Amino acid sequence: MPTTVISGFTHNFLGKAPVWYKQVILLFLVINPIVMYLLGPGVAGWLLIGEFIFTLAMALKCYPLLPGGLLAVEALLIGLTSADAVYHEVLTNFPVILLLMFMVAGIYFMKELLLVTFTQILVGVRSKSALSLLFCSAAAVLSAFLDALTVTAVIISVAVGFFSVYHKVASGKGYQQKDHNTNSDDEVIELHREDLENFRAFLRSLLMHGAIGTALGGVATMVGEPQNLLIAKVVGWDFAGFFLHMAPVSIPVLFAGLATCWALEKLRWFGYGGRLPKPVRRVLEEFADNEKARRTKSDQAALWIQAVAAVILVFGLAFHIAEVGLIGLLVIILITSFTGVTDEHQIGKAFQESLPFTSLLVVFFAVVAVIHEQHLFKPIIDYVLALPEGQQPGMFFIANGLLSMISDNVFVATVYISEVKQALDAGSISYEHFQTLAVAINTGTNLPSVATPNGQAAFLFLLTSAIAPLVRLSYGRMVIMALPYTIVMGGVGLYMVTHAF
């Protein structure tokens, strides 16, 4: 415990983050103004990008909003960008912010329906390969309409539900007991420890298959990933137009990804292949039967309302009746009104998952503003645009893919699409070629970016969620488990981008 006010300040700074991490962030904050003064804004800007990527890579040490936010504020103070430029970036990406605020919250109120659906899938399908394929393909289909973050939130809530049920039983308690700490294994009975570890491995593989599924489906439509909406707005595509332009790349990659999913479960490579222990299956089946028996007529009516809202959501997105985030708000209004969720605090819980990430996204946009103000990516863009036209899509795919592996794909896509749009406005490229480059940018940011958690917004969401520590899903483990998918999806995507247009 701190003994002085000064030690209290140092203890409170970035909370429970390791001391070395706090020291590194302080070092960044000290050297940035010095570099700006001695070496100029160009070098300081690139240094800031490197520091920001570091905070994303260290997401398990400290949520990136805090250190990343401090770096963004400092960038404003030392003149790397301006408040007006940040505001302009936020305004440009306002549809993405609306999506995160309301769509993820809207799906929160559909969790009962989705939990029932995924429970039936999990206890009904006994083959792990078939189950993994079903999870991956279900996540892909859902991501095409709901956005990857939303689907990841659903998969996380399902996994947390299943894990907490068995953890209570393994600790010698009934699964209806409310007061239980799933973060601690201290109360777990020795007899159940091996089954609990095997269950963790089983859930880890399902979570990763599901997360990969969100990338497979998310690349295909304008609402699948936050950056898709951004690209669609810049290019001028509607829902159908976006899908048709992406299909030559997204459809072959989908089939290649599903084949990889099946192969990994059969071969049990890269941490996959964990089976559901029989005692755990019995507990989950009993839980599912008990939940079904306890379901009242009121609960059944609520499930019907959620199903109707899901249909309205899909049609609303397909025909683009309103901005995506506003359709999410419609879902919130419909479900809460017709299921009797009237308490303000109960409604507020729906926004807890999405708002920290929304805040982090605004910090991304501050860094994007620095890149724009200092023209940091202009040399790279100019180099690629100077290549023969036939080579440009492939090079954009590779450049976006490599950057998206170490940085967030929303961040990379925002930068590249706006830079290419400037080239279009300047008359350097035709609109048809601009559309081809937009496909390369979208697929380049969506497919190879599964390599690391900081590449995909949904993966970062998974890594920083409640389920990651419960099933021992660390940054390094995610990278290893994503490797085969990265190779297959990146390879097939690059081939299609260079040969399909």
UniProtKB/Swiss-Prot annotation:
InterPro entries for the chain: Na+/H+_antiporter_NhaB
Subcellular location: Cell inner membrane
Cellular component, GO annotation: plasma membrane
Topology with respect to the bilayer: Multi-pass membrane protein
Cystine pairings recorded for this chain: none
Record keywords: Antiport, Cell inner membrane, Cell membrane, Ion transport, Membrane, Sodium, Sodium transport, Transmembrane, Transmembrane helix, Transport
Pfam families: NhaB
MF terms in GO: sodium:proton antiporter activity
Sequence intervals crossing the membrane: 24-44, 46-66, 90-110, 145-165, 206-226, 239-259, 302-319, 351-371, 395-415, 450-470, 478-498
Catalytic activity: 2 Na(+)(in) + 3 H(+)(out) = 2 Na(+)(out) + 3 H(+)(in)
Domain of life: Bacteria
Family the UniProt entry places it in: Belongs to the NhaB Na(+)/H(+) (TC 2.A.34) antiporter family.
Purpose: Na(+)/H(+) antiporter that extrudes sodium in exchange for external protons.
Entry-linked HAMAP family: NhaB (MF_01599)
UniProt name for this protein: Na(+)/H(+) antiporter NhaB
Name of the coding gene: nhaB
